[in-house]
């Protein structure tokens, strides 16, 4: 897939970004690893995640997506250097409020 410049950051990403909100929610760790392997094999290099992903699922606290991504990176030396990882912090979905303020 052709990569595009991300503004003036020097980063190059495909026009599609993979959503990591499914990790630890609708797909388990093993399925997540398979999806991430396929993503990298096909030349995609951008993944979106957030600390609140899957916090809405019973038994989850949030952070499941990052935990699975961290385990996958640990099991795949060199993969982290190939991936552009987008994340967000500061929201509390249960309280339905923003915890951090922007300036």
Swiss-Prot record:
GO cellular component: cytosol
InterPro entries: AKR_Detox_Biosynth, NADP_OxRdtase_dom, NADP_OxRdtase_dom_sf
Pfam families named among the record's database cross-references: Aldo_ket_red
Protein name: Uncharacterized 11.2 kDa protein in crtE 3'region
């Amino acid at each position: 897939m052709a990569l595009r410049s991300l503004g003036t950051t020097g980063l190059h990403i495909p026009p599609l970004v993979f959503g990591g909100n499914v990790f630890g929610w609708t797909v388990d760790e093993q399925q997540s690893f398979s999806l991430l392997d396929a993503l990298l094999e096909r030349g995609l290099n951008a993944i979106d995640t957030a600390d609140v992903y899957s916090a809405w699922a019973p038994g989850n606290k949030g952070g499941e997506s990052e935990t699975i991504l961290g385990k996958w990176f640990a099991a795949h030396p060199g993969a982290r250097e190939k991936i552009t990882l987008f994340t967000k912090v500061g929201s509390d979905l249960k309280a339905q409020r923003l915890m951090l303020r922007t300036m």
